UniProtKB/Swiss-Prot annotation:
In the wild-type form, the chromophore matures at 20 degrees Celsius. Mutants have been selected to mature at 37 degrees Celsius to make them suitable for use in vivo and cell culture. A synonymy between H.magnifica and R.crispa is controversial. SUPFAM superfamilies: GFP-like. Belongs to the GFP family. Homotetramer. This is GFP-like non-fluorescent chromoprotein.
Amino acid sequence: MAGLLKESMRIKMYMEGTVNGHYFKCEGEGDGNPFTGTQSMRIHVTEGAPLPFAFDILAPCCEYGSRTFVHHTAEIPDFFKQSFPEGFTWERTTTYEDGGILTAHQDTSLEGNCLIYKVKVLGTNFPADGPVMKNKSGGWEPCTEVVYPENGVLCGRNVMALKVGDRRLICHLYTSYRSKKAVRALTMPGFHFTDIRLQMPRKKKDEYFELYEASVARYSDLPEKAN
């Protein structure tokens, strides 16, 4: 429940996985305000550094995976905050237009004033001469996730654009969010949108990265036609 969450919450993240067969581990620490929808994270690669691929493909598993820090307007039930103290999980498949695929599973739990994230990722089929494996990407454009409930699961569908020089590499994201609480204990939100701006203000030698995200959940601003 939202009462367990404070205006300032800490974050700890533990990530491991492979991308095109390269094994790595990352650890992150950060903080944010769950009620204003802003968060920051500082991430170190603890194994497998320097990464031989663009960290940009992992960034959405960190911040865009940190769904407690989404500002929900008053009329939208907050699925994620309702899920505490038990927490929630999500699974995501990201398909890039050049054939690369990234799958991820994340577990979110709460320990005192700290949110704990455990993330496992698997990246396959990224072209050796593509921008991901050549580390030629330059961050993400802002995007909007379409969110809706289905059989007790919150589904997210998104199209993201990775900046590559003067062009964009497009990818499609399919996410399933599952509360650890029984569905009957939740008030599920209706169809809505989540606007996301994910940035990387700083990185160092492909082994240290700083991320910032702002996100807000909203209904459509467009009025319905009167009868």
